[in-house]
From Swiss-Prot:
This is 2,3-bisphosphoglycerate-independent phosphoglycerate mutase. SUPFAM superfamilies: 2,3-Bisphosphoglycerate-independent phosphoglycerate mutase, substrate-binding domain (SSF64158), Alkaline phosphatase-like (SSF53649). Mn(2+) 1 binds at residues 404, 408, 464. It catalyses: (2R)-2-phosphoglycerate = (2R)-3-phosphoglycerate. GO terms for biological process: glucose catabolic process; glycolytic process. Its cofactor is Mn(2+). GO terms for molecular function: manganese ion binding; phosphoglycerate mutase activity. Substrate binds at residues 125, 155-156, 187, 193, 263-266, 337. NCBIfam families: pgm_bpd_ind. Mn(2+) 2 binds at residues 14, 64, 445-446. It comes from Pseudomonas paraeruginosa (strain DSM 24068 / PA7) (Pseudomonas aeruginosa (strain PA7)).
Length: 515
């Protein structure tokens, strides 16, 4: 006979960070006797939910998708931006086999390496650091002809801010003693995603045929002329950069083309124009026989080209591992965060695992959640208490949306009410667990509600924060909490409490030290 499950409940308080400052801190201002009692009597600490600790760039605030992915995966899940940045820092980028293969083929035949990408510090579709590294890699591997075809931003950056980026790349090439910027064009053309193929055609013909509406003898002169025509970065028309005595650059047979955008959606159309044998969206004057066309990441599985950083499938995430061990689990949230405790917590998988059940509680239909700061938390709690009392599940994962969704409204009084409602809900869960001898871990995915005003502007602060998040053990065991934890350590902690061995794929470390 199997033992009756005494559930381990993971309570994720969305947007519930920790700030030492009491100013405009809805958690500090709220009446929260249950929370205060837990912090006074139960082992607790703080863990990181932002920046490189969750696979985001340094200093980047966390978000719900990334937070739940890390919580469920039991390892830091690096986003594409940080995977590439980390590879450059570690030096691995410069030996990337997919890029190296294309570059080396071109070098062996004394052909050119063409670098395409959004030249921008924006960090949304690309980062100029990555383009600099690519130019350095091509030079290191012996390329004599290195050409950058720069797409200008102005959407994820100010509308007229491209000049420092162009100057930086000019300086990079000068330092290498080879290579140059060959063309500039706005992202409006090169990075269309709405099947406006006439725009993509302008970019393709500029890069492949050197066909341009305008020419200039330097990248900065090209930009200045565009500004004089009334164009901002995003809308700069096709311009070939042709220094005195040179010709417009073309893509020739045997050249290598490396597309350095890491975000897929706006890189697909131009990539298809380069590599699809039966491409028919616009007539190509010429389709060069390339030594290689490389996508930095997989823009689409259907595009016939290799990628330098293929998707990393997440295996043995918490849900999958529990299912393999015959454990039952319940995922529960209201509509606003239901995808987070299911799809994202399961590492990007839609289907439930064997032994997994799900409960979706509808979110209230109000214009903004400051009008109903309790949201559907009481109804969510009703179902959790019922599930605990039934003792049917080994693990229950619940998300409470209030801290984040009410925090986003910027209404301080509503945020305080949201925290007070959460406190009542936690009290009910703790009481139910007490009766059956269950345990809970309380944490958050990122901060928000602990900072409701931006002190520098005096305006409401509606965004997430980089603050650490609480980690509280609720139960009868004697244990201590180690410092320096991150969200990726939560799943290994749950396995420790359940007496299950941690799978090799989970590289996080348990936060609890059992006495």
């Amino acid at each position: 006979m199997t033992a009756t499950p005494k559930p381990l409940v993971l309570i994720i308080l969305d947007g519930f960070g920790h700030s030492e400052s009491p100013d405009y801190n809805a958690i500090y201002a709220a009446k929260k006797p249950v929370w205060d009692r837990l912090l006074a009597t139960q082992p607790h600490g703080l863990i990181s939910g932002s920046g490189m600790d969750v696979g985001l760039p340094d200093g980047q605030m966390g978000n719900s998708e990334v937070g739940h992915m890390n919580l469920g995966a039991g390892r830091v899940v690096y986003q594409d931006f940080t995977r590439v940045t980390k590879a450059i820092r570690d030096g691995e980028f410069f030996d990337n086999p997919v890029i190296a293969s294309a570059v080396d083929k071109a070098v062996a035949a004394d052909k050119a390496v063409h670098i395409l990408g959004l030249l921008s510090p924006g960090g949304v579709h690309s980062h100029e650091d990555h383009l600099v590294a690519m130019a350095q890699m091509a030079a290191r591997r012996g390329a004599g002809k290195i050409y950058l075809h720069a797409f200008l931003d102005g959407r994820d950056t100010p509308p007229k801010s491209a000049q420092p980026s162009l100057e930086r790349l000019d300086a990079t090439f000068a330092g290498l003693g080879k290579g140059r910027i060959a063309s500039i064009i706005g992202r409006y053309f090169a990075m269309d995603r709405d099947n406006r193929w006439d725009r993509v055609q302008a970019a393709y013909e500029l890069i492949v045929d050197g066909k341009a509406e305008f020419t200039a003898d330097s990248s900065v002169a090209a930009l200045e002329a565009a500004y004089a025509r009334g164009e901002s970065d995003e809308f700069v028309k096709a311009t070939a950069v042709v220094p005195a005595g040179a010709e417009a650059v073309r893509v020739e047979d045997g050249d290598a083309v490396i597309f350095m955008n890491f975000r897929a959606d706006r890189a697909r159309e131009l990539s298809r124009a380069f590599v699809e044998p039966a491409f028919g969206e616009f007539p190509r004057q010429r389709a060069a026989q390339l030594a290689g066309f490389v996508m930095l990441t997989q823009y689409a599985a259907s595009i016939p080209a290799p990628c330098a950083f293929p998707p990393e499938p997440l295996t043995n995430v918490l849900g999958e591992y529990l299912a393999k061990h015959g454990k039952t689990q319940l995922r529960i949230a209201e509509t606003e965060k239901y995808a987070h405790v299911t799809f994202f917590f399961s590492g990007g998988r839609e289907e439930p695992y064997e032994g997994e059940e799900r409960i979706l509680i509808p979110s209230p239909k109000v214009a903004t959640y400051d009008l109903q700061p309790e949201m559907s938390a009481p109804e969510v709690t009703d179902r959790i208490v019922e599930a605990i009392e039934q003792q049917r599940y080994d693990v229950i994962v619940v998300n409470y949306a209030n801290g984040d969704m009410v925090g986003h409204t910027g209404v301080f009084e509503a945020a305080v009410k949201a925290v007070e409602c959460l406190d009542t809900c936690m009290g009910r869960i703790v009481e139910a667990l007490d009766k059956v001898g269950g345990e809970a871990l309380i944490t958050a995915d990122h901060g928000n509600v602990e900072q409701m005003e931006d002190e520098s502007t005096g305006q409401a602060h509606t965004a997430h924060t980089c603050e650490p998040v609480p980690f509280v053990y609720v139960g009868k065991r004697k244990l201590s909490i180690r410092e320096g934890g991150v969200l990726a350590d939560v799943a290994p902690t749950m396995l420790t409490l359940m007496g299950l061995e941690q799978p090799a794929e989970m590289t996080g470390r348990s936060i609890v030290i059992l006495d």
